């Protein structure tokens, strides 16, 4: 957002009557590194359409992160993704559901990462912390982040949903979706 994370928080708080005080932003490298350090994540389902759409995003992410991740051969159930593939999956926007579905995919990837981290050991958690410190922006101190990471085994993810809860969209000519 123009003005950085602080401006984004101010806008969200003002427009949605929230009281967000802290933030963490991550770049592609952080997602790729975390998923790879966890040994990949497994998703319940990746559709054939999603597998195809991931390819363009994977090309960009491979280039940016200096990786050489391979395309999925197709969709399926219980699909294990590496870091580049998981990041590409989370970026898909142009399917039925548009940006709302993209946000849902992002929540799915994050939940899979947390679940996998909770099954790992403290050595892996420490490697995750070391790997992502250079790839995040946050209002938290390093000590705060270490304390939060140490509690990863106790986290419980509740139900997640997008906003607005009821939504519709349409395409206006070549201008895209609204």
Language model features with spans:
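Solvent-exposed, polar/charged alpha-helical surfaces in well-ordered, non-transmembrane soluble domains
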Residues: 6-14, 21, 29-36, 88, ...
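Residue-level signal for alpha-helical context at structural boundaries
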Residues: 42, 49-53, 127-131, 146-150, ...
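Short, well-ordered coil loops that connect the C-terminus of an alpha-helix to the N-terminus
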Residues: 18, 40-41, 158
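C-terminal solvent-exposed extensions
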Residues: 81, 135-178
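Flexible, polar/acidic helix-loop-strand segments at domain edges
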Residues: 30-124
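Second-shell loop/turn segments in exported
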Residues: 1-2, 11, 16-22, 76, ...
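Solvent-exposed, acidic/flexible segments
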Residues: 2-9, 21-28, 83, 99-107, ...
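Structural recognition of the beta-strand scaffold that forms the well-ordered cores
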Residues: 22-25, 88-89, 159-164
